Amino acid sequence: MNKITRKKESGRHAPELSKQSYKDGLHRLQVELVKLQRHFINCNDKILIILEGRDASGKDGTIKRIVQHLSPRETRVVALGKPSDRDSTSWYFQRYVPYLPAAQELVLFNRSWYNRAGVERVMGFCTEAEHEEFMGPVSDFEHMLVRSGIKLLKYYLDISKAEQKQRLNGRKTDPLKQWKVSAIDDQALKNWKRYSAARNPMAPWTIVRADDKHLARLNIIKDVLTRLHYAGKDERLILSDPQIVLTYDAAYLENGVLAP
């Protein structure tokens, strides 16, 4: 097996793909996604994809490319806001349950119940007792979803501190990304180490090294297509790069593959 390491970077790295190569590759993979949707509609499958990661790790852009040419009737994106007062007094998982996929549906969660393990814990929006109460049953909750027939895929998009800083600064000056600017953006960098400490117990995930957002998008789609069965699959197109999409290994916390 090839050794996987993280290259130290300061700012944006040189692109691995030309703009045209990226567009061509994305188009071919989106054709495969349409095939996948046709198949899971015919077979009454239920698919749930969760994307987690630090602020500005590329979740929005990845989801946009996945759903771009899919039927909106059978595709839903879930990005829940601040919990209501009622949510705050309910069983923690309760607010997510209504959004789970039914037969013939693909649902993508842009962040998920893992908010409790990440941003809520770091920012003090939950108590340590509430965090521990979440971490205990979360695996059982997900096993229950899988036993009910939901095909569950979980991706954690991992970026370097330098890349996050550049992307957050870019949001502030881009008039088309003002909706992404948040009052807690500055806290993402200030609390970098606390987010790392909160991230680690959430494993295992499929890890995506996402400093290059184009490569991350393509390889996430490839991994989704590899993991799910559908008719007419073009196997030549869907092999993801093992340097970008990784099955979680605890050693990655020590050898620098995951951003420290």
Describe these PLM feature segments.
Residues 49-67:
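Glycine-rich phosphate-binding P-loop
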Residues 56, 83-86, 112-115, 158-165, ...:
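Conserved nucleotide-binding/hydrolysis micro-motifs of P-loop NTPases
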Residues 197-260:
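NTP-dependent small-molecule kinase module
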Residues 119-135, 145-196, 237-240, 244:
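A glycine- and Lys/Arg-enriched "phosphate-lid" helix/loop adjacent to the NTP-binding pocket
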Residues 48-52, 150-160, 182-187, 201-216:
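Phosphate-binding beta-loop-alpha motif at adenosine-nucleotide cofactor sites
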Residues 1-28:
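Charged, amphipathic alpha-helical linker segments immediately N-terminal to NTP-binding catalytic cores
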Residues 31-41:
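Pre-Walker A adenine-sensing motif
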Residues 18, 25, 73-135:
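Conserved nucleotide-sensing/catalytic segment adjacent to the nucleotide-binding pocket
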